[in-house]
Amino acid sequence: MSEQEKPIFTISVLVENKFGVLSRIAGLFSGRGYNIQALNVAPCEDPAYSRINIEVQEENEKLNHIIKQLDKLVNVVEVVDFRNVPTVYREVVLLRVRFGDKMHDIIDICNIFGAKVLDATHDTLTIECTGGVSRISRFLNLMADYPIDMLTRSGKIAVIKPKDNGPKPEAD
């Protein structure tokens, strides 16, 4: 199976917020030849713990193996596989774009996607856009028509949807 044919999965790993934990997790991936597509780490609801969201492009069987290996690591509290549970995904992109005489066009695109202009200079705008992965991709496809000086993406972050039948989240 080629790299393009392999699906991209998101795994969430709850870990003790201790020195070396991220290094051991990254080492597990690199030692087995698995490539991490995106990685996001931050303290969570309890500052003694961090949540690591990892995007990996791999076959199902190999992903199952990765999850089992992660579960065995010291300081790993919980591994969540988002493949079979209802999940809310979001991504954040920050970019700095040169606008020339197209500032209003860029702001129109931002308004369509609910993006925010965070900073402006005489020739650049710094923009934040948050949403589902396909929404971010559509936003970036339109922004590609303008000179982008710098771009950074968070990668997917995820939480499991609650089991109640409350209000539906906004569509992607």
Question: Regions from the language model: what does each represent?
Answer:
Residues M1-S50, E55-D172:
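Long, contiguous binding/interaction regions
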